[in-house]
Amino acid sequence: MEVILLERVAKLGQMGELVRVKDGFARNFLLPRGKALRATAANREKYEHMKADLEARNIAAKAEATKVAEKIDGQNVVVIRQASEGGQLFGSVSVRDIIASFDGQGVKIDRSQVLLDAPIKTIGKHSIQVAVHPEVEVAVSVTVARSAEEAERINRGEDISTRREDEDAAAEALAAAGEFFDPDAQFGEEQPTEE
C-alpha cells in the first residue's frame, strides 16, 4: 500500500514522502495513529492543503522537544535492583523502570520514546537513546546498582567487584573453622570414643 507520511517516521521516510509499506503496517500502525494517509488523488490534494499547517506543528513540536532534550541530555538516572555477587540482576530493568526514574526527576517521557533494544540484566552504567521527537534524539545513562552507595561508586568509575574481599573473608572463615575440626580425620568413619 502506498501512503503519504504526515510526519517523519524512523527507518521509513520524511514528512510528505510517498512510500510503499505493507498493508498491515499501514492499517494497524500508520493510519490509526495519524502518521500517514492513503495515497489517493483526494488525499494528495488534502495533503497539499494541510502541508503548511503540518510543517508549522512539526516545527513547534520540535522546538518543545529540543527543550526537553536539553534538560535530559547526558543525564544519569539510578535504578536500584537486587543482584547476584557476579553482577547479574534478579530480573531486569525495562523501559517502564527507566520512565519511572525520569518521572522521579520531574521529566515526562513516553514509553515509545525510550529506545532500548533489550532489557538491562547486569549491574553497571548503560547508555541508552531517548527519541523525544522523530528528529531529536539524546543519549542518557542508566546506572543499575544494588544500593545508592554502589551507584555512587559506579558513577565515580570505581571497580565494584568484591571478589577480592570475599576471598579474604572466606580464607579467614576457613582458618577459624580449622580450630574446631581435626584436619586428619577420615570422613565416613566414626572415630572411637574413649570411655
Swiss-Prot record:
PROSITE patterns: RIBOSOMAL_L9. GO terms for cellular component: ribonucleoprotein complex; ribosome. Keywords: Ribonucleoprotein, Ribosomal protein, RNA-binding, rRNA-binding. GO terms for molecular function: rRNA binding; structural constituent of ribosome. SUPFAM superfamilies: L9 N-domain-like (SSF55658), Ribosomal protein L9 C-domain (SSF55653). One of its GO terms (biological process) is translation. Signal peptide: none annotated. The keyword Transmembrane helix does not apply. Binds to the 23S rRNA. Belongs to the bacterial ribosomal protein bL9 family. HAMAP family: Ribosomal_bL9 (MF_00503). This is Large ribosomal subunit protein bL9. It comes from Rhodopseudomonas palustris (strain TIE-1). The gene is rplI.
